[in-house]
Amino acid sequence: MENVNTYSKKERNMFLTGMFGQNMIYNVVTVGLYYYFQNVICLPAIAFGWIFAIARIWDAINDPMMGSIVDKTRTKWGKCRPYLIFSPIVICVITIAAFFNGNYANAKANGNKTAMIFIVAWAAISYVLWGMSYTVGDIPLWGIISRITESEKDRSSLISLSRIIASIGAGLVVISIVAVSQSLNSAFGLDTNAQKGFIVAAIIITIIGSALFECAGTGTKERVPNGSETKTMKESFALMWKCKPFRRILISGLLRAPLQLMMNIAMTLLTYYYCKGNLTYAFTKLDIFIIVLILAGGLFIGQFVSMAISPALMKKYETKKVYNLFSGLSAVAFVLLFVVYLIAPTDLSKIGFVVIDGILFFGTGMGFGGVNVCQSVMISDCIDYEEYHNGYRPDGIFFSGQSFITKFSAGISSLFQAMFLTQ
């Protein structure tokens, strides 16, 4: 039996630990900082809407640039590991710094226009800097998957596990960061939305997440050899479009951008219809908590189920067919959520409609989770395809396409939200 050059169990666990930590940090910002900007320092809605939109669109452009840099990297540690070793500390510092800002509401009440401008400017600068530093770690984190094993089976398995672990790390922070921050404020004898509790919570969670993230760099080994060829940034950008299979993945991902907006709308339904604009309201009323648990639980469980079964489905069917199946599932589930709302706009809190919506949230979760796994596997296949046909492995630039799709979709979604907020 032929020996395959692949990762050990310990190495797999170290990588997954890093993935867990990275997603903790990501959601400190996408959930915690977003709430902090909106409800704690009270940035104008239009300001933080445009900040998030512009930063994410810039990130989408910046990602391929970073991917090109990764592909040109040649060190004794490999192509991706240097960034995984050194980027967590930088991300940690910038993440914490983003929370150290003034209070816009207080500055406005005092008529201090200079402070108001400074607060908005620092919010924008720190968020853009965070996005750029996060990219330095994110592209190599996904790119190294195709470099630590030569086994297609092990790679697909690791991608699936990575998506599951990432969702767990994300979910842990999503459901806890605001509640922990407000609990700390109560312990400090402050208002629940005071800055101190959020800053302390951000520091604690970010340091823990960064320490775990470090494991992805220190605990892995790149096995797939580098070729001698390198490409300029211009050539790398051209390669993204020239490779037909990868081009199709990019186009498909961009065409799915409206589904990200639909996800935001679904979460808005959860936040404003059931929780009066504040998810922490669910912790004050048992019936609302149960409703949120059913709906959010359906979403997360759906993701975990699809991520777990995706490798088996891709073994039996073509990956693109599985991808299309999950894409269609999420689209249909979103449409049906809207139909249910039209049928019973004032009765969605009744148990029958809660169960129906819970099932539909489960369907959307399955769709999103399955698509994410299939997309990562197809990108890995494209790297092998390019190496087979042209002798060049574009690990960084191709996996930057995954981040490009995610951030471009999020940016377009945030842009639409910001536009609606100006109406």
Question: Residue ranges of each PLM-predicted region?
Answer:
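Membrane-embedded alpha-helical bundles of multi-pass transporters/translocases
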Residues: 2-423
